[in-house]
Amino acid sequence: MCIRDRAVFTACNDDENGTTPPPAPSVENLGGIVTENMTLTANTEYKLTSQLQVKAPAVLTIEEGVKITAADSEDPIYILIEQGAKINAVGTVENPIVMTAENKTAGGWGGLHICGYAPTNAGSGFSEIGNAAYGGNDANDNSGVLKYIRLEYTGFALDDEHESNGISFYGVGAGTQVSYVQTYVGADDGLEFFGGTVNVDHCVVVDCTDDSFDWTEGWSGTATNLVAYQTDASCDCLIEAD
């Protein structure tokens, strides 16, 4: 069951002129299992209180200007798009979509994970976070659209073997569109591809602790206009290609 509830916060009136300040924006809580289409409305703030797991054939639509803030929690909090489900998250230059965390440090939350039916050279597998199946034979599989999105403070680790990146693409197909995506101050990798055929362009990774861009299991898509900016000496590599 998906949880969506609204909390409204208002400020006291301390204005000496007696005018009433505008109310603070409402914040909707998010979390749970999504089995029906869901839309996150433009210019609205959401608090991610647990994992948000989208199951087929549901579509998660995120409109421009949406801000999603993951709660500060010892439990894994992430967004997972399963095989056959979609995410259509389309921001704009002036009004991007922002996914961030209350804990403003690398590893503050678990990031975005997308699983598709495209082939990998390791056969089928399961995501490191969420244990969702991925892989198949549909090179043109479509998991949706990501455009003008910034993800901050990602990289939550369950343990030494199960880590999250900014965005993890698991067997994602070429029908998926990925453009103008940024990850900022993340633990582990910025973008990682586990097989699949998805093509990406205009992607920026700033200060991750491991690899800026990482691909394995025979990813065969294309990548154009990539930028990696690293100031942390602990950063591993700009690119790791297995």
Each predicted region: which residue ranges?
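C-terminal motif of bacterial Sec signal peptides marking the signal peptidase cleavage site
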Residues: 8-11
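Beta-strand/loop edge motif enriched in small/polar residues
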Residues: 13-242
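Conserved small/polar residues in nucleotide/adenosyl-binding loops
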Residues: 1-5
